[in-house]
Amino acid sequence: MANLIDGKLISTQIKDELKEEVTELKKKGIEGCLAVIQVGNDPASSVYVRNKKKACEYVGIKSLSYELAEETTEDEILKLIEKLNADSSVNGILCQLPLPKHIDEDKVIDAIDPKKDVDGFSPQSVGAMVIGKPGFLPCTPAGIIQLLKRSNIDIDGKSCVVVGRSNIVGKPMSLLMLRENATVTVCHSHTKDLKDVCKNADILIVAIGKPKFIDASYVKDGAVVIDVGIHRNAENKLCGDVDFDSVVSKASHITPVPGGVGPMTIAMLMSNCVEAMKR
């Protein structure tokens, strides 16, 4: 039976450490402020934005919320970002994705000042990550690295398979695992013999966007399984990309959904916000 990797517990530990750091920074007159832009009222996005605000409150960072109508133009969003870039009291800016179809996400991300890009999505942040320079790391992959390290799971020299190649999780995840000296394979919709590739993984990280897609037949005995997916099943219960019930008896460690990767994403956003305060 696998050990559960408790993302809630680990994320709270991180937020408590950050809270202490923020208190010390405030004594030096350094304040933190995160501006969150949400376009439209997608229910999932609203939940994420609410959780981000709560986390800001917890660690002692001020949050500004810009809730814009679905029909807001790209130009209006870019003007708002320009204003926030110029506001020295704002250290972090994030635009909650996905954006409505008529808005070019890349253009919006590119408009955010790299020094305030606490999501770690800007070309400058990504470039710094590729060559191992300091910069803001994307929150979900950075959170997964913390989950592994704080659970005393050795990454060095291990075979890691990342299923999914999105710009937000899959690609940066593979780079961060490479930084930790894992031997990394990235799988995607064109990968042949996916099952065989996954079965070679000491650490299997799944971000494929398909509910319960990875079952026990994809997992070798004793593997560490990290589930990035989040979906609602027919009974309206949350589930991941991994079929937890079948994999839990085969893995050595596994993240649950909910309560695994999700809380870590927000903890690492707070970590980036604190980093932005110090710059």
From Swiss-Prot:
NCBIfam families tied to this protein: PRK10792.1 (NF008058), PRK14186.1 (NF010783)
Note the PROSITE patterns from the entry: THF_DHG_CYH_2
HAMAP family referenced in this protein's UniProt entry, alphabetically: THF_DHG_CYH
Give the protein name, as stated in the record. Answer: Bifunctional protein FolD
Q: What are the annotated GO cellular component locations?
A: cytosol
The record describes its quaternary structure and partners as: Homodimer.
Residues reported to bind NADP(+): 164-166, 189, 230
User: What is the protein's species of origin?
Assistant: Agathobacter rectalis (strain ATCC 33656 / DSM 3377 / JCM 17463 / KCTC 5835 / VPI 0990) (Eubacterium rectale)
